[in-house]
Amino acid sequence: MKPGKYTDRYTAEDVRAYRDAGLWGDETMFDLLTIQAEQRPDKVFATDGHRSLTYRELHDSALRLAAGFHARGWRAGDAVAVHLPNWVEFIEVVTALSRLGIITVPIMPIYRRDEVGYVAGHAEVRAVVTPATFKGFDYLDMYRDVRRERPDLEILVARPDDAARAIANEAGSGVDLLDDVRTDAAADLPAQPSADDPFLIVYTSGTTSR
């Protein structure tokens, strides 16, 4: 299931009214970050107790990630699941995806095999960004199980442990490390998406996650 354009849900009159009221604009998420990176580059934007990022650091880091994602063949309109705790990597990844017009599918950290299997299939995600482990749970092992049903699923691991590094070194594992994706070749990025392009698919946190 891939989302359509906003015109599938809103009439032309709705769109004009929202724009006239200033509720809708033409800036993308990355546009807004770029403005802040220029105006307050050294101000801390996010911290998680392990890492902190200023506006400029987030901007530059997201560009490097976006270049790495693009080099992997990820393109506008693709969907990528982001199954991370409240880490700064979550913000980096979502910002990088937004720069490319790739649709973020955030998954709550408490979701397990049944829920993530459904979301990954229903949203037709091509990849997932996940921890190796978090609070005693092995996320990487779970997604390797999902990959048995979806052998094309790419798995990127944030903050890997030694076991995750070893798996990433195995030929054909489908597992890579997020930090290894970063590149400095940001100049080759495609044009930015429109503010009207799909950006996010959110699944409910109800009893079925469906």
Question: What name fits each language-model region?
Answer:
Residues V80, L97, P198, T204-T207:
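Conserved S/T- and glycine-rich ATP-binding loop of Class I adenylate-forming
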